[in-house]
Amino acid sequence: MFSKADRPVLFATFVLVSAAICPTPAAGGQGASQSHEREALGHGYARPARSPHSSRSEVIAPHGMVAASHPLAAQVGIDILKAGGNAIDAAVAVNAVLGLVEPHMNGVGGDLFAIVWDAETERLYGLNATGRAPYELNRQVFERQNLDRVPGTGPLTWTVPGAVDGWDQLLTRFGTMGFAEVLAPAIAYGRDGFPVSEIIQGQWAASERSLAEWPTSAATYLPNGRPPAVGEVFKNSGLVRTYEAIARGGRDAFYRGEIARTIVSFSESNGGYFTMPDFEDHSSVWVEPVTSSYRGYDVWEIPPNSSGIVALMMLNILEGYDIASLGHNSAETIHLITEAKKLAFADRDRYVADADANMLPVAELISKEYAARRRALIDQMRASGTVRAGDPTDNAETVYLTVVDKDRNAVSLIESIFGGFGSKVVPADLGFALQNRGSGFSLEPGHLNSLEPHKRSLHTNMPAFVTKDGKPWLSFGVMGGNMQPQGHTQVLSNIIDFGMNLQEAGDAARVRHGGTLQVEPGVTDAVIAELERLGHRVRRAGGGGMGGYQAIMIHPETGMLHGGTDPRKDGMVIGY
């Protein structure tokens, strides 16, 4: 037995076997060779026959687990747990590291949502840590500039960053550590540097031209006049100073101190509309997660302005079909998922907005009765023609993470600056980009999501949690703009309808509808032909856009933690 101090860390491991490792065929010839081959297969070097969707196992561990989109961040979370911190402490530490190592995806210039399972009270808590539009920004500003929509980048897209206040709310209510402890690993990596991975480098390079338009952004993210190369060590002294200020002064250092004053001063000089009251008046909101059941499992999401109810609407519609009998990624299954998505997104575009500014019919939208009425609109033999044209929220960059600790506290957290490097603007020398979440507003007067001063925009982000018989079962999320509700639906169907484990559920081929139906490799040519016969416009997916997934399950029988992560990103699950 291992003592508490020297328990081994459990890693998901790939084993590559070269021919030199295998025994040389015996003189007996083919029969001996086949014997050795059977022996090698018997020792586990072949993919299990039951796992056509995955090339690696779930991670399984007894004590604590972290699933994050970057290995360094996941390891930091485990270090926090082993140092005596709980899941909430670890989640904030992981998020801070992700803001450094995946700066195009997230950071303190962005917003977050979280769902917390508190083991002591045995209930879920939701946190909406999203920011609002500046007090001085209104639709007339855009009219004077002859703009009929909010741009995708620049100062007119800025909303107050909510992440730091979200961290403070999480640590104050449920954490055991302070900012100095949880930010220390990110500060160290920012000062000493970290090597840039291949996936991140490619996404970083895609924003080179727009980052170069802002001298402060270029100084931060284009060292030596270019994006870092694969394997090159990147340091961020500006973000280190920002994190150190938060570590010393807490959330007020960001919203009432020098950081806020620097952002406001930069805004005033560069065509923005931020004022100090925008930051001083900012606060996160604890909310009741909303829920609906899917085949006996209770699925929990954050209410609007999050898009969480969209996944619940899709699942409610699909529950009326025997999906398992139709087959995984069959034409029939993909058709139903796509048609459910069209209906749910039509409702999202009409009803998902800032709940503080609108009366929203959330309970009605996620009711089984409403789902039955919407389901009746689906023609199982023909694709509907009601396809939304154009979507300003489609290019979203986000990180999702989840942590479960030894006491079975759990956190499901998603954080984002929206587009790649957000607004593309780094304020002064603070070391992070401000989000472009304001581009999610409509400029249509009377629309529930219409831009107003001090209002939250529609958010694509949505962490999720699943309980079974009142007990915590699954903490998961699928980052990636409008893929999120579609990803939640497909992952849960993979697990519940098709019996996949967490790794299989994430690795399996996905589909995404956004006018055209994109399908990943693994969807057969015959299925594509049948989908086209039904009236769908189909193309093979390429270049990303299918989301990134992390999940941790608390096994209801053994109590063990099972984890899965997405091969589409640099994700890693680590347990101990």
PLM regions: where:
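Bacterial N-terminal signal peptides that target proteins for export
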Residues: 1-12
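Bacterial N-terminal signal peptides
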Residues: 11-23
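Noncatalytic scaffold domains of N-terminal-nucleophile
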Residues: 30-75, 87-249, 254-256, 260-306, ...
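Internal maturation/activation junctions in enzymes
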Residues: 44, 320-417, 430, 437, ...
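Extended C-terminal subregions enriched in glycine
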Residues: 407, 455, 488, 497-544
